C-alpha cells in the first residue's frame, strides 16, 4: 500500500530540505518551515530568504505571433510588452471566472508562463484550446528548478553569482544570465511584497545554487512564511482567495482588464457583470479583538451574515490579525465595522485598505 507521502511529488531540491517540517500542498510534499515561520518571515522582511518553488508550473509558449495570439485571449493589454518585460494577468473561462493567475514573461519569439502548481495541467489545456495550432505549448516543469530569493538584501546576495549588473533589471523585468558560470534565467518578481528574484535553472544547477546561497547565510523559508508574507502584501492565493467561480471584478483585479480590447475569453460575461453590478467584493479586514480568522469563517454585520473569510493570519510585521474575504458590496467600504465568527465567538473587525503592508522603497540593498 502506498503511503500519502510516497504518493506526493517532490521537487529536485527535496534531498536538501531534510530537517524541515513538511506539509502536503496540492500533489506536492513541500517544506512548511525550517526553523520557525516567524523567524523565516522576519528574515525576508529584514534581510533575505529563499524558497523552493519548483512545484510551480513552467510553460513556454513558442511560435510566430505568440504575443498577438495571447492579446486576443487574456483581459490585460499586452500590446506594448517587449522582450525582457513581464506582465501579471489572469486566464478566464467563458463565464469570466478565473482559471488561474499567471505571470507572462516576454522573450524573443516565445512567452514563458509561470503558473500555479495545482493548475499546470489545466492551464496547459486552456492554452491548447485557445491558442492557434501554430503556437507550441511546452511544459518544462519537471526539468527546471525555481528558487525565489526575496528580501531587501536579495540583489546584493545574488549579484556576486551573476555575470551582469542586476541593477539594470528593474521590477517585472527578466533576463538570461550566467549564474555560477552556467546559463540561467532570472526575473525581478516575487510573492512576498519585497524586492527579490525568481531564478530558473536546470535541476542539477538548482542544488548547487541552493547550497551556495545557504553557505552565504541566506535563510531557507517554507510555505508557512510564504503565506504570511503574501497575505501581508494582500496577494491572492489561487484556489483559496479566487477560483473559477470568482471573477476579476469580484477579486479586486479589475485593473487587469482593458475594456478597450474588442475581445478576450470571458469578456461578454464580465461586461454583463460590470453593467449589472457584482454580488460580492474582496475586502481586507483587521481584527480588533483576540482571534485569527481562517478560511471559511463567516463575516457578520450585526446579526446578518454578509460574507466569508478566504485567508487570515496573525501578521508578524504588523502585530495584528488580518484577513481577506468576500462581503456584499454595500459592506465593503473602508472603515466599515463588521465581525468575524471565530469558533463560538464574534470578533470585531474593520475593513481596511489593501495591501496591509507596503515595503519602504529605500530598503533594497544593491
UniProtKB/Swiss-Prot annotation:
Gene Ontology biological process terms in this record: glycine decarboxylation via glycine cleavage system
Gene3D superfamilies in the cross-refs: Aminomethyltransferase beta-barrel domains, Aminomethyltransferase fragment, Probable tRNA modification gtpase trme, domain 1
First-tier enzyme category under EC: transferase
InterPro entries reported in the protein's UniProt record: GCS_T (IPR006223), GCS_T_bac (IPR022903), GCST_C (IPR013977), GCV_T_N (IPR006222), GcvT/YgfZ/DmdA (IPR028896), GcvT/YgfZ_C (IPR029043), TrmE/GcvT_dom1 (IPR027266)
GO cellular component labels: cytosol; glycine cleavage complex
Assembly notes: The glycine cleavage system is composed of four proteins: P, T, L and H.
Function: The glycine cleavage system catalyzes the degradation of glycine.
Similarity annotation: Belongs to the GcvT family.
NCBIfam families: gcvT, PRK00389.1
Name of the protein this chain belongs to: Aminomethyltransferase
Organism expressing this protein natively: Thermosynechococcus vestitus (strain NIES-2133 / IAM M-273 / BP-1)
Amino acid at each position: 500500500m502506498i503511503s500519502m507521502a510516497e504518493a506526493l511529488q517532490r521537487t529536485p531540491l527535496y534531498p536538501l530540505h531534510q530537517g524541515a517540517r513538511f506539509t502536503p500542498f496540492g500533489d506536492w510534499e513541500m517544506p512548511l518551515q525550517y526553523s520557525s515561520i516567524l523567524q523565516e518571515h522576519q528574515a525576508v522582511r529584514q534581510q533575505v530568504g529563499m524558497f523552493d518553488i519548483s512545484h510551480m508550473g513552467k510553460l513556454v509558449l513558442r511560435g510566430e505571433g505568440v504575443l498577438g495570439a495571447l492579446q486576443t485571449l487574456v483581459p490585460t493589454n499586452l500590446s506594448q510588452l517587449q522582450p525582457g518585460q513581464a506582465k501579471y494577468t489572469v486566464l478566464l473561462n467563458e463565464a469570466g471566472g478565473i482559471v488561474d493567475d499567471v505571470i507572462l514573461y516576454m522573450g524573443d519569439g516565445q512567452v514563458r508562463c509561470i503558473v500555479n502548481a495545482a493548475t499546470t495541467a489545466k492551464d496547459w489545456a486552456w492554452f491548447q484550446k485557445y491558442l492557434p495550432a501554430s503556437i507550441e505549448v511546452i511544459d518544462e516543469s519537471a526539468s527546471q528548478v525555481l528558487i525565489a530569493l526575496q528580501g531587501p538584501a536579495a540583489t546584493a546576495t545574488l549579484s556576486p553569482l551573476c555575470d551582469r549588473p542586476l541593477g539594470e533589471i528593474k521590477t517585472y523585468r527578466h533576463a538570461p544570465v550566467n549564474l555560477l558560470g552556467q546559463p540561467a534565467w532570472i526575473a525581478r518578481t516575487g510573492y512576498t511584497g519585497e524586492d527579490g528574484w525568481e531564478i530558473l535553472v536546470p535541476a542539477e544547477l538548482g542544488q548547487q545554487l541552493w547550497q551556495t546561497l545557504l553557505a552565504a547565510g541566506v535563510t531557507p523559508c517554507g510555505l508557512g512564511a510564504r503565506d504570511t508574507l503574501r497575505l501581508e502584501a494582500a496577494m491572492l492565493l489561487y484556489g483559496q482567495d479566487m477560483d473559477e467561480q470568482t471573477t476579476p471584478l469580484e477579486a479586486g483585479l479589475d485593473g487587469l482588464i482593458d475594456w478597450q480590447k474588442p475581445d478576450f475569453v470571458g469578456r461578454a460575461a464580465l461586461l454583463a457583470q460590470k453593467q449589472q453590478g457584482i454580488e460580492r467584493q474582496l475586502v481586507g479586514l483587521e481584527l480588533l479583538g483576540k482571534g485569527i480568522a481562517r478560511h471559511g469563517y463567516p463575516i457578520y454585520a450585526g446579526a446578518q451574515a454578509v460574507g466569508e473569510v478566504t485567508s487570515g493570519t496573525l501578521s508578524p510585521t504588523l502585530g495584528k490579525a488580518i484577513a481577506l474575504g468576500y462581503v456584499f458590496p454595500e459592506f465593503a467600504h473602508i472603515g466599515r465595522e463588521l465581525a468575524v465568527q471565530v469558533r463560538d465567538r464574534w470578533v470585531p473587525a474593520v475593513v481596511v485598505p489593501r495591501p496591509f503592508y507596503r515595503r519602504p522603497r529605500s530598503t533594497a540593498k544593491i
